[in-house]
A protein has these predicted regions:
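Extended, low-complexity, intrinsically disordered tandem-repeat tracts enriched
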Residues: 63, 86-90, 131, 214, ...
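Solvent-exposed edge beta-strands and adjacent loop segments
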Residues: 1-68, 105-130, 135-143, 150-220, ...
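Short beta-strand-to-coil "C-cap" segments at the C-terminal boundary of structured domains/repeats
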Residues: 133-139, 293-301
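Charged, amphipathic alpha-helical segments and their flanking helix caps
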Residues: 2-3, 89-93, 100, 142-161, ...
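Short, acidic/charged, Gly/Pro-enriched secondary-structure junctions
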Residues: 68-113, 227-266
Length: 301
């Protein structure tokens, strides 16, 4: 019988519970193992083929999952620049979580170096995680302590919105918004030296950047329409032209038009880095707004 995808899981070591736990609500995962090579062919070799020699090894893991309540924890983790202990293994078909200690199971240290949170209208909110290895991979020699996780709660994308303005407590959403994405990237540099044992690359974090993007509908005659109770293409263009330092919050929302601010997921300051208007024939006009994060963001209220 062939292994089904739901029974190949990525587990993260929980330092509080001192146990490995599966990444919750995952929909897919990928493990990449890379051998970096250098051509060792010389003038002494007969023929025209290269002779690749392995100079180092690298590995990475990516996970797609529904965006559950651990979004704040992931936002905190990536900017803490602290490596995780990861493991991948086959899991039991009874719960898709209990490990089977497959011969290909491995564990190692890795940085969460890329995080994307997506909150799109009428879609399940989702997140993408990218981990880059910073240690050798180890085979399992003893049975690691593991724990199962309960199914997490997730929400539809329309119930999370971006609030943005030039005041420190932004109260206006982007009117007519369709999509919202927050992307955080941790910069890594190779810290491998002649003193490093083995062949696996070692990484060192140097800093992080983040950006926010949104797509929204353009309202006809919006510049002369009465109050639309939200930021529009016109107001955002004014902020862009003034090079205004903006304040933003991504928060849960409720109410008839999903504009009543609830719990804040994260917040910070930004600059409007680009605005692109999309106007195709016989299609609704939209515009894309990109925000470049300014300074550290905060998690929670």
């Amino acid at each position: 019988m062939r292994l089904k995808g739901q029974n190949f899981r990525i587990l993260v070591y929980d330092t509080t519970a001192t146990k490995f736990k599966c990444i919750g609500m995952a929909t897919s995962c990928t493990v990449n193992l890379t051998a970096n090579t250098d051509d060792a062919s010389t003038k002494d070799d007969v023929g025209g083929s290269a002779k690749p020699e392995v100079t180092s090894n690298a590995w990475s893991v990516s996970v797609e999952s529904l965006n559950v309540v651990d979004a704040g924890a992931m936002l905190t983790a990536i900017k803490s620049m602290t490596p995780f202990t990861l493991m991948w293994d086959e899991t039991s078909t009874t719960d898709n979580q209990s490990i089977e200690e497959a011969s290909y199971a491995r564990k190692g240290q890795a940085y969460l170096n890329d995080l994307t949170l997506n909150f799109n209208d009428r879609e399940n909110s989702a997140k993408s995680l990218q981990f880059t290895g910073t240690s050798a991979l180890e085979k399992l020699t003893t049975t690691p302590s593991t724990d199962t996780i309960a199914a997490g709660s997730y929400t539809k994308g329309q119930f999370v919105r971006l609030f943005i303005s030039d005041s420190s407590n932004p109260a206006l959403v982007i009117a007519g918004a369709k999509t919202l994405s927050l992307h955080v990237s941790l910069s890594l540099e190779s810290a491998t030296t002649k003193d490093t044992p083995g062949t696996f690359d070692v990484q060192e974090p140097t800093g992080y950047t983040y950006d926010i993007s949104s797509n929204a509908l353009v309202a006809s005659n919006e510049t002369i329409t009465s109050n639309v109770d939200g930021q529009t293409l016109a107001t955002l263009m004014d902020f862009y032209e003034a090079s205004t330092l903006m304040y933003w919050q991504i928060a849960n929302v409720s109410g008839a038009n999903q504009r009543t601010k609830g719990a804040v997921i994260c917040s910070g300051q930004c600059r409007i880095s680009s605005i692109a208007v999309n106007a195709a024939n016989r299609q609704v006009a939209t515009y894309d707004t990109s925000l470049a994060g300014y300074g550290d963001y905060s998690v929670g209220s």
